[in-house]
C-alpha cells in the first residue's frame, strides 16, 4: 500500500462548508488502495480563528487528517499573516520528522512556507514531490501592494522562494494553464505539467441542488455572485451596472450574493444606494449554494483589473448550474472559455456601462439565457467534472510511486 501525504495549508475540515479539491482527491486515492494523510493547520483562514472541530468525525474518515498549530492572523493582508505562515512551516518541518516516510508528497501552493517545508523534506528523503498551484504568490499580494519597482523589491524573497519550490517539483499540477506555465518556467524536472481545473463533482452537485427547496417568486430574475467578498472582486461594478438598468427591468431583478470576506460590510453599505434589491446571504453550505445557483438566471464574475486569478471555484459552480456569465476577468484563459463555448459575455473590468449592457441583453432575451446556460453546462461536463478530470492527477501520482 502506497502512502501519500497531502499538504494543504488552507484546507477545510469535513464539517466546514466548501468543496475542497484535496479532500476529494484524498477520497479518490483511498478508493484505489492508497494510505493517505492530509496535513493542514488548526487555524481557519476563512473564519480567522482556531478551529473547533468534531474530532470523532475526523477519526471516521478513510484518510488521516492532521491539524498543526498556527498562531493565526486577523486579516488576509497583514504582516501577522506572514509570521503565522512562517510558524506553520516550522511546525510542519518538525511534524514530518515524526512520521514514517511516505512514498510521495502532494503539496498545495499557497502557502509558500508549507510547500517549502515539504520540498526540503522530499529532497532530504529522496521521495517524489508534486505541487498543485492554486494561486500565484507573491503575484496575488502585488495586487494589494501595487507600487511599481518597490513591490518587486519587497516581494523578491517570496519570488525566490516560489522559484525554489517550482524548481524542485517532480510534477507541476495547476488549476489553470496560466498557473501551470508559471510553475514550468522554473521547474527543472517537469517540462509538460498538468492543468486540472478545480471543478466540481457534477453528480453530487446535482444531487445537492435537488435535495434543497428554494422559494423563488415567478416574476423575479436572479443575478448571482458566489465567492469571496475581498479585494480581487468588484461587487461595486455590478451594483453600478444594476443602477443603469431601466426602472421597469430593475424592479424584477434581485442580486443574490453568496459568500463573505473582508469587504463584506463595505459592499453592503454600497448596496444601500442600489435601486435593485440586493440579498447578502453569507457563506452557505455547499448544497444550499448549489440549489440557489440552479434557480438563478445569470451569474456575474466581477474580477478587478490586474487580478492574478485564473480558473477558480466559481467558474465550475456557475458552469455546473448551467448559468450564462457576465465577466470582467482579464485572464485570457477564462475569456477564451466563455467565447469558445458561447456561455458568457466578457466586459472591461472598469466599465459599468458595458456590464449593464450585457446584463440588460441577457435579462431581455430569455432564449439567449437558455442557450448560453445550455452551453455553460456543456462546458462543465467537458472541462470541470472532477469525477473525470481528476483521473489525470491519479495517473501522475501512480506513475511517480511505481
Predicted regions and their residues:
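N-terminal subdomain of nucleotide-sugar transferases
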Residues: 1-60, 198, 240-247
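Conserved donor-binding/catalytic core segment of Leloir-type glycosyltransferases
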Residues: 5, 215-243, 256
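Membrane-proximal helix-turn-helix segments that form the acceptor-binding/catalytic region
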Residues: 93-94, 116, 120-124, 152-172
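Carbohydrate-associated surface elements
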Residues: 178, 199
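Nucleotide-sugar-dependent
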Residues: 233, 285-292, 299-319, 326-336
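Nucleotide-activated donor-binding/catalytic signature segment of Leloir-type glycosyltransferases, i.e.
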Residues: 250, 265-290
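A short, well-ordered alpha-helix in the C-terminal region of glycosyltransferases
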Residues: 361, 368-383
